[in-house]
Regions:
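N-terminal secretory targeting modules
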Residues: 1-56, 68, 103, 180-185, ...
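Active-site metal-binding loops of divalent metal-dependent hydrolases
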Residues: 61, 84, 114
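Conserved beta-strand elements of the Class I
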Residues: 56-58, 80
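Short, solvent-exposed loop/turn elements at domain surfaces
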Residues: 63-69, 88-91
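A short beta-strand-loop structural module common to alpha/beta enzyme folds
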Residues: 78-91
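Short hydrophobic segments within beta-strands
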Residues: 58-59, 150
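Alpha-helical cap/lid subdomain in secreted, periplasmic
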Residues: 72-78, 94-231
């Protein structure tokens, strides 16, 4: 009997320790790697190209959406889109080598800057934004690629950064920097909606729901304008 009691006491004493042991966690799935400049976004597409494109359209969500909304425009003209939604000029500069220069196009069509004004990666002076644009232009020119600079669309609000207020003045200033630089260096500069009434400070709703991202009709106007340049 004494032996039974001792065994029971030993079992009871060890119970808290046994139940306190944490269950072995299941192996966690490794999250997909995402670099700051998102080099991985077009790595596969770049490796699968069988010939150099006539033009690389380089930019942010506007360019990203263009290739998705009207892919036939790109394939039929031997163009490729290398836009990434939300990107600033700093990020574009970092991936320029992989997504533009390495593809050896005849042209780089650059539309960028609105996300810098929106402070997507923090506050940045317009002069520094312009320096990024100039750096991209100078780098592609070293590789015999012709740059084409595009002006930012007018808008009185940035819906994902409403607290910043009306960005009109900054857009005008940056566009003036871009156009002045282009003129001084004999670079093609495109204002896609030059002939559209923008007296409201925005693109018409028939072309863009937020005056930043064009709809298909807006992209069709852009296509007719850029084809005048990419000869």
């Amino acid at each position: 009997m004494k032996r039974v009691v001792l065994i029971l006491m030993a079992v009871i004493a060890s119970a808290p320790f046994a139940f306190s042991q944490p269950a072995k966690p299941a192996a966690a799935e490794k999250p997909a790697m995402r670099t700051w400049a998102m080099h991985e976004r077009y790595a596969k597409a770049n490796s699968e190209l069988t010939k150099s494109p006539k033009a690389v359209f380089f930019g942010d969500s506007i360019t990203d959406g263009w290739a998705k909304r009207d892919p036939d425009f790109f394939t039929s003209n031997n163009f490729v889109g290398r836009g990434i939604s939300g990107q600033t000029t700093s990020q574009m500069l970092v991936r320029l080598q992989a997504d533009v220069i390495a593809l050896k196009p005849k042209y780089m069509v650059l539309l960028a800057g609105i996300n810098d004004i929106a402070q997507n990666n923090g506050q940045i002076e317009l002069e520094n934004v312009m320096q990024n644009i100039v750096s991209m232009v100078e780098l592609v020119k070293l590789h015999k690629i012709k740059p084409v600079l595009c002006l930012i669309f007018p808008t009185t609000k940035i819906k994902w950064r409403m607290a910043l207020g009306d960005p009109t003045d900054k857009i005008i200033r940056l566009n003036e920097m871009i156009s002045s630089y282009a003129k001084a260096h004999k670079i093609q500069c495109v204002e896609y909606f030059a002939d559209i009434d923008k007296s409201s400070g925005n693109l018409p709703e028939s072309l863009s729901g937020d005056s930043i991202h064009p709809n298909l009709d807006g992209y069709k106007i852009m296509e007719s304008e850029i084809l005048k340049v990419l000869k």
